[in-house]
């Protein structure tokens, strides 16, 4: 098997909003692999990440979903739709035995009811506590038992009718008047997933690509957890085709000789660049101690260094370019990415105005 260049996987700090909305970069990939990997990861992320969702509900005195509810502004179908939008973080242990959890709710409080009014259940935590549920009129009340299970993707209420039948008597409820109503279940915690790719060295005969994956979740799992779970699902499928357990990564990926050579030649102290104290310290903390290492940094790698604000990045770019001109250094890179990404940096250095 011909070896391919080692790839790197990292989070793009310049485009990170929070742990639930961020971008990952995979590079360098052989030509065509960015599209191939990106497509399968995106489809898996949107369809196959495990979460929990309601699938059935029993509301006091409600026989069918089109029924009006006395003392409530909402009818049954609107109430169910509102409850369906509640998102949960869960403990795996409570679903190990029967893949079933129940939440009981009862109130006669007048006014608007939100997810935050639902009592806490061991092993379950509501993420979107501001989710609106219903508006109770004076003298009215609301009582329901909500049933949840683990799953993947989207299951409509018709299919959940069969799920209710399968659970049978295990769906225990103290509510005497009313029927079990099936609900649509949206298990997927990934709200958005976008992929993009670009060529790294279009002027070279050996064209390589960079894959960017932007993920936004519903806050029940982090974007990093979601992409890791997607990768495990994909690998599990390919294990059937090839003996992956016995495949050593060293057999597939070649050593990065270029990086090794650069490390050997890295002898000029970073102080020779004449950077500000703040810029130099940030580079040293990131383990860049020589001029050669700084010159070898791509624009994207530079923008991802922790504690580098806008002014520090500009300082490094200027000093780096001056040094390159002096020694005739040419790496074929441009500073376009840095110029664009500086506007995206929200965390400028302390004390820099």
UniProtKB/Swiss-Prot annotation:
Superkingdom field: Bacteria
Region (Alpha N-terminal domain (alpha-NTD)): 1-245
UniProt-listed Pfam families: RNA_pol_A_bac, RNA_pol_A_CTD, RNA_pol_L
Swiss-Prot/TrEMBL catalytic activity: RNA(n) + a ribonucleoside 5'-triphosphate = RNA(n+1) + diphosphate
SUPFAM superfamilies according to UniProt: C-terminal domain of RNA polymerase alpha subunit, Insert subdomain of RNA polymerase alpha subunit, RBP11-like subunits of RNA polymerase
Record's signal peptide: none
Function: DNA-dependent RNA polymerase catalyzes the transcription of DNA into RNA using the four ribonucleoside triphosphates as substrates.
Family: Belongs to the RNA polymerase alpha chain family.
Protein's recorded name: DNA-directed RNA polymerase subunit alpha
The species this protein was found in: Mycoplasma sp
